[in-house]
A protein has these predicted regions:
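Short acidic low-complexity segments
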Residues: 1, 107-117
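Asp-based phosphoryl-transfer active-site loop
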Residues: 2-23, 40-43, 218-219
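Substrate-recognition element of Asp-dependent hydrolases with the DxDx(T/V) motif
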Residues: 8-10, 30-58, 71, 90-94, ...
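Short, acidic loop-to-helix structural element flanking the phosphoryl-transfer center
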Residues: 18-41, 49-53, 69-77, 84-86, ...
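Short, well-ordered secondary-structure micro-motifs within conserved domains or adaptor modules
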Residues: 114-130
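Glycine/Thr-rich beta-alpha phosphate-binding loop at enzyme active sites
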Residues: 148-185
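Conserved Lys-Pro-Asp/Glu-containing loop-to-beta segment of HAD-superfamily phosphomonoesterases
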Residues: 181-214
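Acidic, Mg2+-coordinating phosphoryl-transfer loop and its flanking beta/alpha structural elements
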Residues: 207-229
Length: 229
């Protein structure tokens, strides 16, 4: 398989590891790709961590040497999307350090209350009512509503925890408006990953454990898929 594709887009949690649990087969798969000099990019809906943090986790905790350049998160894809719009300067953010760093890297001014050109929402484990209030008011006054992803649950060693989709659903209910969703299974993150690697859809395969996110992302983007379990 490593000779058939020029590039591999690979999910992380549930595919290469689960929480702190190592998947030996995942490590062997990455080693084979590295040995064959195949290009691969970890494409994750997790918006809470920076690429450096993701790479460090893979390297230090899962014995998979990784650089930040081999990581593409939904937060990075969201920042790329807003930058391409060209009319967004002030962003009201609900999220964690991964989303913050991605937005700041693109030069956006982050605000905690309106006015704002866009509201960017991802998983925020410090969410509170006031954050939802400010985001609601900003969207009601015309801010674009953009979500990193709408995963309902976040799998880890504790079980299936509430995901970013839980927060997005609350805000969507408040504003009675659907967001632009960036992460898998939407095509925006896949298009960003293709641009990042310089490859075309027919040159890559999407590898993941979740049909509703990873596999549908490939299908929606006309990219071959490989479901692992």
């Amino acid at each position: 398989m490593a000779q058939h594709y020029d590039g591999y887009f690979i999910d992380l949690d549930g595919t290469i590891y689960q929480g702190t649990k190592r998947f030996p087969a995942g490590k062997r798969f990455i080693e084979r790709l590295a040995e064959s000099s195949s290009q691969y990019l970890f494409v994750t809906n997790n918006s809470t961590k920076t690429p450096d943090e993701v790479a460090a986790n893979l390297t230090d905790n899962h014995d998979i040497p990784t650089t930040a350049e081999q990581v593409y998160t939904s937060a990075m894809a969201l920042a790329d999307y807003l930058a391409e719009l060209g009319d967004v300067k002030r962003v009201l953010m609900i999220g964690e350090i991964g989303l913050q760093v991605a937005l700041e890297a693109k030069g956006f001014e982050l605000v905690s209350e309106g006015p704002a050109d866009a509201v960017a929402i991802g998983l925020d484990r410090d969410i509170n009512y006031e954050k939802l209030v400010q985001a609601t008011l900003a969207i009601q006054h015309g801010a674009k509503f953009v979500a990193t992803n709408v995963d309902t649950n976040l799998p880890n060693e504790r079980g299936m925890l509430p995901g970013a989709g839980t927060l997005v659903a609350a805000l969507q209910t408040a504003v009675q408006q659907k967001p632009v969703v960036i992460g898998k299974p939407e095509t925006i993150i896949m298009a960003g990953a293709l641009r990042r690697t310089g490859l075309t859809a027919d040159q890559v395969v999407m590898v993941g454990d979740n049909y509703n996110t990873d596999i549908l992302a490939g299908i929606n983007a006309d990219i071959d898929t490989l479901l692992v379990y």
